Amino acid sequence: ANGYELGGIESGKQQNADGVPFKAIREDVLNHFRKGGLLIMNWTMPHYNGNAELLEEYTKQVAKYLDTLQDGYGIKAPVVLNLLPIDGKAWYCQLSKDEYIELYKKLQDLLEDNDVTNVVYGYSETYKPGKKLMERYPDHQIDVINVTYLQTRNAIRLPLYQQSIKEIITQALPFAQEHNNAFGMTTGIESIG
C-alpha cells in the first residue's frame, strides 16, 4: 500500500502539503497500480470559510487530478480516498460532529457531480490514547476505516503502544465489521529521519 496527501492540489499548487510534486505522485501511483498495489489518498482540505463556490472549485480540482490517474489504455487507478482525515490539527476537526458529517457528505456529492469514478471512500482517524474512536464516522458510502497511531521518536513507550493497539482494535475492528467496512491501521514512529 502506498499513501499520498492531496492537500494543495485544490489550490493549483505543484506540490502537496508534504512538499512532494503532484507529477511525481501521479507517476508513483501509476507504477504502483501496474504492480497491483493498494493506493490510498488523504485530502486534508484547506478552510474554505463557508464559500460554496470555493468549495466547489476545490473539489473540481481534486476531481481533475483523480481523473489523470489512468494508464495509457485509459484505465483509471482505483484509490481509497480519505476525505477530511481526523488528526486533531486540521480546521475541520473543530467542527461539530454534525457539521463534519455534513461537509464530508457534501464533498462526496461534489466529487460524484464531477464524475469521479475511481475512488472508494475511506474514513481516517488518528488515535490519541484514551480517546474514543469513530465519533465522527459519516456512515455514508464508506468502504474503508483507517486508524493511525504514531509515537514520536523522542517518546517511544512500548507499554503505551501495546495498550493503545489493543484499544484501537477493541474499538475500531468491531465497528468496521458492523458497518461492513474494511479495516486498516497505520502505525509506527512519526518523523524518523
PLM region spans:
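Extracytoplasmic, non-cytosolic globular domains
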Residues: 95-128, 138-144, 150, 169-176
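Structural recognition of the beta-strand scaffold that forms the well-ordered cores
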Residues: 1-6, 38-43, 78-83, 120-123, ...
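Aromatic-lined carbohydrate-recognition surfaces of secreted/lumenal glycan-active proteins
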Residues: 78-85, 104-131, 180-192
